[in-house]
Amino acid sequence: MPQKHSASHRAGSNMGSSAVTVRCPSLPDFGPTSSFKHRGPHELSETCSFSKKEKDPMLTCEHLETPRLGFPNPAVSPSPRKKSVSLRKEKEESPELCETPKLRRKKCTLRRRLDLTLTLLKGDSDSQSSSLESNISHSLSLEKRLRDSTSGFPKEDNFSPLVTSTVKTEDAISSSQNSRLHFSQHKTSTIDDSKDDCGLFEVECLSPIEGNDFKDSVTHFSDSGLSASDENTCPELLGSSGSQTTYGADVTTSVTPVSSLIAKIKFHGSQTLASSAEVRDSLSTPEDSGFCSLSWDKSEDFLSDQEGSFQELQKHRGTPTVGDLVRQPKHPGRLRRLPTLQEQGSQSETDDEMQVAHPSAGVRVGTASGVLESQQGSEEKSGDLTLSFKDLSNTPALQLVCELFMKSKRKRFEQADDQEFSEEREEGKIARLQHVLAGLIGKKMGIERLDILTELQYRNLKHILAMVLDSLTAESLYSAWNVSRNWRGIVAQDKRANRRRKLFIAQLKAKAQGAAVLRVQDAATRLRLLSRLALRSVQAQAQAPNGQNEQAPAQSPWGEVLTPVASSSLTHLRSKQEQYLKVARTLFTDEALKPCPRCQSPAKYQPHKKRGLCSRLACGFDFCVLCLCAYHGSEDCRRGSAKGRGSRDVLPGSAQSKRNLKRL
C-alpha cells in the first residue's frame, strides 16, 4: 500500500510546532497519467488528509511518485492545485480539485485509468508527444521548488517518495489485466444526478440513424481509438468537461477533469493500423456498460454472462456474418437497461466510448440487407416457377403435388428399362404421399362444392355432427336421408335424429290417408271421461281411419269388443259426433249446441232468448229451450213442467230466495 507523508514537519525542541502548508502554483491541467500507472484497484487510497490537531483544519494535497515507468524523475500528482477547505463545506466543493478517491463502491473512474496504465506499459518513451514532455519538465521544476522551500528544516533535508508502487515490471501486464477483469464485473457511474449538463449524448446517438450532433462528435474524436487488445493498442480518451462524480453521503469528493487531459495529452499506438476499418473493428463495448446489444462485433456466446479478459474479446472480434446480424440477443433484460439508465441520469463511463461512430456498421447492415433481399428474390422466383402450373384452382395442394409427381414419374418411365420395378417404387411413394397429405390443412381450398358432413364423419367428429343434426328440422332430416348413402349412414348413427325422421314419416303417411287428428278446445279433459254414458254423444273423439274399420274389430269407447249390430250403432254415433264438430266450428261467442228434440241433430241456441234452431236442413226445427216445444215467443210455456222449472229459477236476493233460505 502507498504510504502517506505530510508536508508539515515539526522542528526540534528549540522551534515551535507549526504546520507548513505548501501552495502549488496554478499548473496547466494535467490528467491522471503518472499517478496511476501501476496502481491497481486494491492499491488506490485516499491522499487527502486533514490536520485536525491545528486550530484551523487545512486540506493538504500530497504528491504521488511512480519511479518505475521509464521516467528519470518522479512525476507530480495529477492534481497540483491546493485549496483550503473547511470540513463543513467539503460537500459543496467546486469540481476543480483533482483528488484520489477511495476504492469503496467503485467511485473512481478505474476504467480510464486502467486503459492509460496498459497503454503506458506497452508504449515506449519515444511514443509520447511533446506536450507530455513539457508537462513532465514542469512537474520536475515544481519538485525542485518544493525541496528548496523545505530545505530550511534541520530534521529532514531529503524527501523520500510519498507514494511508491508495489507492482513489479514483469507483473504489470498481468495485474492490469486482473484489474480490468475485476472492474468489468462491477458497474461504475461518473454522471452527477444533481446536474443537468452531464455532457452525455442524446438517445439518437445510440440509434442506427446518425444525427447532426452525432456526426460532429465523430469528427471531433476521429483521431483517436480505444485500446481493446494488447496487439492493436490505440488508446483513446473520450469524455466531457462536465463528467464528474459527486457522493453527498461521503465526505470525500472525487473530481476528474477530463477536458484538460484531452486537450494536453495525445497518445499514439505502438503499432500503425492498416486502415480505418480495422480501427472500427477493434472498437468494442464492455459488457458492464449495458449496451452489449448495440455492438455488431459480439457473437451470441459473448452476449451470455461470460465475463473474461480482453484476450477473450479479441477472440470474438471479427467480421460479422448475416446470421450474426439477424441473430437476436439471449438476454432481453440488457436491452431494457438502456432507457432505465437514461431516465435515472446515471450511465456507465463507457457511454463516452459509444460516442465513437461505427461507419462500417451501416455498410455492414446494408450488405446484410442486400444479401437477404437477394435470397428472398431468388426464393420468390423459384416459387413462381414452381406454382406456374395450370388447373390449380380446385385443389391447390393435391393437384400441385400430383402434377409434380406425375412429371417426375414420366421421366423415370422413359429412362428406366424395368417398368414393373419402377411402378412398385412409385406406388410406395404414392402411399407415403397420401399419408402426408391426409393431415394437410387447406388441401381442398378452392373447390366449389365440399361435402362437409362426409369430411366430419371421416375425421370421426361425432359431437359436431350431432350438433348439426339437432339444428335441422324433421323435414330437413328426411331430405338429408334421401341425398346419398353417406348422409343416410350419418343420420342412422344419430339415434335422436333417426327417431325424429321416423315420426315425420308416420305423419306423412297419416296425412296421405286423409286422417287428420282433430281436437276441440276442451277435448283434453273429456278424453278421460269415456265411461260417462250420459255425455257420450257430445264427447270429442278422434276419428279412426276408414280403412281400419274393416281390418280391426270395432271397440267401444270403454274398450269392449262390439258385435256387428253394436258396431253399426257405433258408426252412427261417430257420424253424429262428426256432425257436432262441424257445427261447433261455426258457433258464435253467444251461442251453444244442443240436440234437436226431434232428430237429435246438433242445434244452435241462444241462452238469453231461450230459443234453439236445428242445424240439419231437412229438420230445421225451431223450438223453445225450456219446454222443448215449438217456439212460442213471449207466451208462457203450455206444460206445467215449464212452470215448475220457472219456479226453480229464483233470482238471488229476491224475496223468494230469502224465504227459501229461512226454510232451510
Curated annotation (Swiss-Prot):
Q: Which gene encodes it?
A: Fbxo43
Q: Which residues carry this modification: Phosphoserine?
A: S289
Functional note: Required to establish and maintain the arrest of oocytes at the second meiotic metaphase until fertilization. Acts by inhibiting the anaphase-promoting complex/cyclosome (APC/C) ubiquitin ligase. Probably recognizes and binds to some phosphorylated proteins and promotes their ubiquitination and degradation. Plays a vital role in modulating the ubiquitilation of CCNB1 and CDK1 during gametogenesis.
Alphabetically sorted, this entry's keywords are: Meiosis, Metal-binding, Phosphoprotein, Ubl conjugation, Ubl conjugation pathway, Zinc, Zinc-finger
**What is the superkingdom listed in this entry's lineage?**
Eukaryota
Q: How is it modified after translation?
A: Phosphorylated on Thr-190 and Ser-289 in response to calcium, which is a prerequisite for ubiquitination and proteasomal degradation.
Alphabetically, the GO molecular function entries are: zinc ion binding
PROSITE patterns noted in UniProt: ZF_ZBR (PS51872)
Where along the chain is Zn(2+) 2 bound? C624, C627, H632, C637
Zinc fingers (ZBR-type), renumbered ranges: 592-640
Sequence ranges of Basic residues compositional bias: 328-337
Q: Which GO terms describe its cellular component?
A: female germ cell nucleus; nucleus
PTM-bearing positions, type Phosphothreonine: T190
Q: How does it assemble?
A: Part of a SCF (SKP1-cullin-F-box) protein ligase complex. Interaction with SKP1 does not occur. Interacts with ANAPC2; the interaction is direct, ANAPC4, CDC16, CDC23; the interaction is direct; ANAPC10; the interaction is direct and CDC26, during spermatogenesis. Interacts with CDC20.
Q: What residue stretches are annotated with the F-box domain?
A: 445-502
What is the name of this protein? F-box only protein 43
